[in-house]
């Protein structure tokens, strides 16, 4: 299945060169959110997405770089983030040189983690897309019970929004359409189930080591 093209960032100096020459900065590309053009020559990316319950325990998590290479480091990071954010009304936090946007839904906390230079609005668009896609998929409130019963679908949703850390989609309608298409493919469904089982194994291993 062909994936949508991720939003590229402009090359360094793309706008500055035009300004120095006396001309206007280049216009935003079609489909690119206004005001979100950063100067790093890379794609819009995130470091991690995770969902915790209201006790700070991991339910779903995917990390896209080696900032936290081990399960132990990831779990410590998640616990620290939860302790910092679970009792505040804000939707954004800065922690350990990273930008974190988050949302509370009943007994769940959803987090999207980006670099310190990543645009907050872009991170928030990923978080909103994830929440609205899960809400549509579950057809109920986004809460722990329903998430656990539909974990394979939750992994499919996340994989349509982010691939290898690169943001692919921020429209929940498009995400749901693609998830429904992939759900008809037995191989991909088995892959998502395998992700759930692997996540469960890692959590059990970590709990035994504590």
UniProtKB/Swiss-Prot annotation:
Organism field: Homo sapiens
Membrane topology: Peripheral membrane protein
Biased segments, Low complexity type: 13-34
Designated gene of the protein: COPZ2
Basic and acidic residues bias: start-end ranges: 1-12
Quaternary data: Oligomeric complex.
Protein name as annotated: Coatomer subunit zeta-2
Region (Disordered): 1-34
GO biological process: intra-Golgi vesicle-mediated transport; intracellular protein transport; retrograde vesicle-mediated transport, Golgi to endoplasmic reticulum
């Amino acid at each position: 299945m062909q994936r949508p093209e991720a939003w590229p960032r402009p090359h360094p100096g793309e706008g500055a060169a035009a300004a120095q020459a006396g001309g206007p900065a280049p216009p935003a590309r079609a489909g690119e959110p206004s005001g979100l053009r950063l100067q790093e020559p890379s794609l819009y990316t995130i470091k991690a997405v995770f969902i915790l319950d209201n006790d700070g325990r991991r339910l779903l998590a995917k990390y896209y770089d080696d900032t936290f290479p081990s399960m132990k480091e990831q779990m410590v990071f998640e616990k620290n983030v939860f302790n910092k954010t679970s009792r505040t009304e804000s939707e954004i936090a800065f922690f350990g040189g990273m930008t974190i946007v988050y949302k509370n839904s009943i007994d769940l906390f959803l987090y999207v983690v980006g670099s310190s230079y990543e645009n907050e609005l872009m991170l928030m668009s990923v978080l909103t897309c994830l929440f609205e896609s899960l809400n549509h998929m579950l057809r109920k409130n986004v809460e722990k019970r329903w998430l656990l019963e539909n974990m394979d679908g939750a992994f499919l949703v996340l994989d349509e929004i982010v691939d290898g850390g690169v943001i692919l989609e921020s429209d929940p309608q498009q995400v749901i359409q693609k998830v429904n298409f992939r759900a008809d493919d037995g191989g991909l469904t088995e892959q998502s189930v395998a992700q759930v089982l692997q996540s469960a194994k890692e959590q059990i291993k970590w709990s035994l080591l504590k």
